[in-house]
Regions:
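N-terminal mitochondrial targeting presequences
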Residues: 38, 53-57
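Class I (Rossmann-like) S-adenosyl-L-methionine-dependent methyltransferase catalytic domain
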Residues: 59-112, 126-176, 197-198, 202, ...
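Conserved class I S-adenosyl-L-methionine
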Residues: 115-123
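A conserved beta-strand element that flanks and buttresses the S-adenosyl-L-methionine
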Residues: 183
């Protein structure tokens, strides 16, 4: 007997290829629930009312911090590792994220040696980007809103003998300083749409030369699939997921004195990310 989740995945497989490509925004949330959880669509009014009551008392920042300090840390730490304790959807997300990280590393390598250059990685997670950049010789300042994530990144770096990377706990708005390069990868999905331009502006204020940012783009089919995901309540619905208008991001970069130099789209079955590299002009 198929569960509601299995039925949904079966339906996804029959969609047009462009519809199958999905961002972390919707199906990822369902896929990351414990495998033993039973999902069934709830009445729209019940789901909406419950969500409204929760969101009126818990702001985005608190929600994200609590999630990634608790059950979210355990799930995503497995995804961002070589652990075999992941399902096919989680493995697909891992592959997509790894592709984004590799593209950034390739771009930076193509621009020459970064040994001694300063890099600020905002929303560093477990160090997926910060650690390889440190191995390339960059001086790393990496932060995450989650103590658990930042500590895990620091432990991984220490185990590798890395000494040129500092990891600490901070939200995006509180990050200060000046750096050659500022990165913010797969973080904007947790950031409110109406504050996106302001956040991009802040990241730019930290960068002397370059900003790299990725986000889940706002398109009609991702909006549709996000709505489908919202029909499935339960423990997996832990944080709000935001899709962003690419033009808003580009306008914010331009306003801050940056110009997009390179861009890339990474898409797998359950991961979709738009990556922009902007340089100061």
């Amino acid at each position: 007997r198929l569960s509601a989740r299995s039925l949904l995945f079966s339906e996804i497989k029959q969609l047009h290829p462009t519809m199958k490509t999905f961002s972390v925004a919707a199906l990822a949330a369902i896929a990351l629930a414990p495998n033993t959880a039973a999902f069934s669509p709830a009445p729209r009014s019940v789901t909406a009312n419950a969500r409204s009551a929760l969101f009126s008392t818990v702001d985005d920042k608190t929600e994200v911090r609590e999630y990634f300090n608790n059950e979210g840390f355990n799930r995503w730490n497995k995804i961002y590792s070589e652990s075999d304790e992941v399902n096919n959807v989680q493995l697909d997300i891992r592959n997509g994220h790894d592709q984004t990280i590799q593209k950034i590393l390739n771009w930076i390598s193509d621009d020459g040696d970064i040994a001694g250059k300063t890099v600020c990685d905002c929303g560093c997670g477990v160090g997926s980007l910060a650690i390889p950049l440190a191995q390339m010789g960059a001086k790393i300042s990496a932060s995450d809103i989650s103590d658990a994530m930042a500590n895990e990144a620091a432990d991984r770096a220490k185990a590798m003998g890395i000494r040129n990377a500092k990891f600490y706990t901070s939200d995006l708005e509180s990050v200060k300083g000046k750096y050659n390069t500022v990165t913010c990868v797969d973080v904007a999905i947790h950031y409110p749409t109406e504050k996106m331009a302001e956040m991009v502006g802040h990241l730019c204020s930290l960068a002397d030369e370059r900003v790299l940012i990725s986000f889940a783009p706002k398109t009609w089919y991702y909006e549709l699939l996000k709505k489908i995901g919202e029909l499935f309540p339960g423990p997996s619905k832990t944080t709000r997921a935001y899709l962003h208008d690419e033009q808003v991001v580009r306008d914010a970069l331009q306003k801050a004195g940056f110009e997009v130099a390179r861009e890339e789209m990474t898409g797998t079955s359950f991961y979709f990310s738009r990556l922009l590299e902007a340089k100061r002009v």
